[in-house]
Amino acid sequence: MSSETFEFQAEISQLLSLIINTVYSNKEIFLRELISNFSDALDKIRYKALSDPSKLESDKDLRIDITPDKENKTLTIRDTGIGMTKADLVNNLGTIARSGTKQFMEALTAGADISMIGQFGVGFYSAYLVADKVTVISKSNDDEQYIWESNAGGTFKVTQDDDGRAIGRGTKMILHLKDEQTEYLNESKIKEVVKKQSEFIFYPIYLHVLKENEKEVPDEDAEEVKDEGDDKAPKVEEVDEDEEDKTKAKKTKKIKENKIEEEELNKTKPIWTRNPADITQEEYASFYKTNDWEDHLAVKHFSVEGQLEFRAILFVPKRAPFDLFETKKTKNNIKLYVRRVFITDDATDLIPEWLSFIKGVVDSEDLPLGLSRETLQQNKIMKVIKNIVKKTLELFNEIAEDREQFDKFYSAFSKNIKLGVHEDAQNRPALAKLLRYNSTKSGDETTSLTDYVTRMPEHHKTIYYITGESLKAVQKSPFLDTLKEKNFEVLFLVDPNDEYAMTQLKEFDGKKLVDITKDFELEETEEEKKDREAEEKEYEGLAKSLENILGDKVEKVVVSHKLIGSPCAIRTGQFGWSANMERIMKAQALRDTSMSSRRSSRPTEGNDRTVKSITQLLFETSLLVSGFTIEEPSGFAGRIHKLVSLGLNIDEDAETSEEKEADTVVAEAPADSDMEEVD
């Protein structure tokens, strides 16, 4: 047999080194990860056999077998699944790193639990937690039988298995256990781990144990001894024939015999087929943890009857997966079965992208068994299955009844809820009820839009909100002044996804949603309106002068009653970008620059130099307090220095070149500047 030696991909070598050289107490998770991989292999061959039954000819018994060997210190696990070709062994077990390899190493370095390894797609390597050498023998219907082996020293060997015992189809994995890990050869330990972590695996798991039994056999030696004694002391005695047979039958002895016995470790039927009333929370947790390393946050177990019959169990995890929003991520959180036969874990129509964190099982009685992935997406019955979204929303509302649980949920999955508000028009009103924000009246707690509406004055028709980079920044915004004075509540939106969601939501419970950093009409009394119009007329000349000085930096300058503590502020137009959105778009490398084009410079003339400088300074400070950035910080600094000089009565007969530049330079305007106003 000729062997080929390959080097592990660099990231995989680093991962193996990390696993081998770091001390972890929870090593038993290796068995869960390997059994999960074997179960996936069985799913794949079962699915292929739906369209081509001949795929199972080499072995129709789909199962997982575990065999401990104390004498040789090996633990063997095998399946009758799809098996691996030579290329599969080379690529999947060494030369091509999974997308999660790097992320998992970073998580481990940061102190994450080793139990998370399966969530990053690298569960196979958990074998090296307990083994110093791993041998994999695999046979695919599409190739010869091959052996993969490595002691994780940076390389692995792949050999065609011409001399070994044919395994038919599937994969056999032999773990050569470290001296300190031989407890995993004990029958009781294996049973304990499988029951705790893999009890609800769909396929039977058999444990093969060598047991010593006592057996009664005829004792030939005893009969010979008795005959010799009879010769020495002959005695004539008539014995009944039946009695003689009985005497001979007692001439036996007990011997010890070693025999391998098998025992099924997971006899429990699929949990989703049982009555929810008969299932304990511990059983749900055990089922969930066959594919995760920690408990779930919430579960929904239900059945649907009528046009389509199906059962489903849906789980909300405790935390978001590392690759939640990766565009190329394989969606494998919901497994679809038809009459307990696994069909696919990639039914993209089964659940919307914003719910991709939901895990579970859907088992239909009505879909055809031979359904392919392609026809699955076209089949109109799948549209009916989408009512699982409604059940999921019910689950979210149940979580919301417990403040502590909902806080955990919202912390992990608020981005998904906001994505749903943005993308799912049909369920947008229901999702909006799940949104939570801090506000001017909520203190340290968050508030829902529903609670906001209940606190609104009867005549009030608007829900006000402000967007910004942080809670601290928006709490000190000058835009809040008048609204606070009028006792109007304002929501604080500080997540980049908030503004996207609000632009789609537009209103809630018949109340219009308004961003106070943009141009809007403030509710006012007739007397307030009269005072505002009088002041606008009085300061019309000043506003016009400021417009002339600022030129194309602004659309217009207006007298505002929306400010109290600040002399001025920058607002964008109703349909333009807010300061927060401009900041977000600037951070995107491939942003659309057409919306943030700047106006060309326009020189100003005929104005007093000091007035111009102070006006520029007011404009720039307004940019800062309104959440924008200053494009020419050196010019801003020059104007500050000049203002300090004036305050100290320092004579400036001549301007420095920096000051001249500060007077004449025109800073770039914020996004969507054609809709911009100065209050």
Swiss-Prot record:
**Which residues make up the binding site for ATP?**
37, 79, 124, 373
What SUPFAM superfamilies does the record point to?
A: ATPase domain of HSP90 chaperone/DNA topoisomerase II/histidine kinase, HSP90 C-terminal domain, Ribosomal protein S5 domain 2-like
**GO MF annotations in UniProt:** ATP binding; ATP hydrolysis activity; ATP-dependent protein folding chaperone; unfolded protein binding
**UniProt region (Disordered), positions on chain:** 216-250, 589-609, 654-679
Where mainly located? cytoplasm
Q: Where is this motif: TPR repeat-binding?
A: 675-679
Where is this chain compositionally biased, Acidic residues type? 217-228
Which keywords appear in this protein's UniProt record, sorted alphabetically?
ATP-binding, Chaperone, Cytoplasm, Nucleotide-binding, Stress response
Give the UniProt subcellular location, in the record's own words: Cytoplasm
Give the record's GO CC terms: cytoplasm
Query: Per its UniProt record, what InterPro entries does this chain match?
Result: HATPase_C_sf, Heat_shock_protein_90_CS, HSP90_C, Hsp90_fam, Hsp90_N, Ribosomal_Su5_D2-typ_SF
Can you tell me where the transmembrane regions are?
none
Described by its record, this protein's role is as follows: Molecular chaperone that promotes the maturation, structural maintenance and proper regulation of specific target proteins involved for instance in cell cycle control and signal transduction. Undergoes a functional cycle that is linked to its ATPase activity. This cycle probably induces conformational changes in the client proteins, thereby causing their activation. Interacts dynamically with various co-chaperones that modulate its substrate recognition, ATPase cycle and chaperone function.
Comment, domains: The TPR repeat-binding motif mediates interaction with TPR repeat-containing proteins.
Q: Can you state the subunit structure given in the record?
A: Homodimer.
- Entry protein name: Heat shock protein 82
Q: Which gene encodes it?
A: HSP82
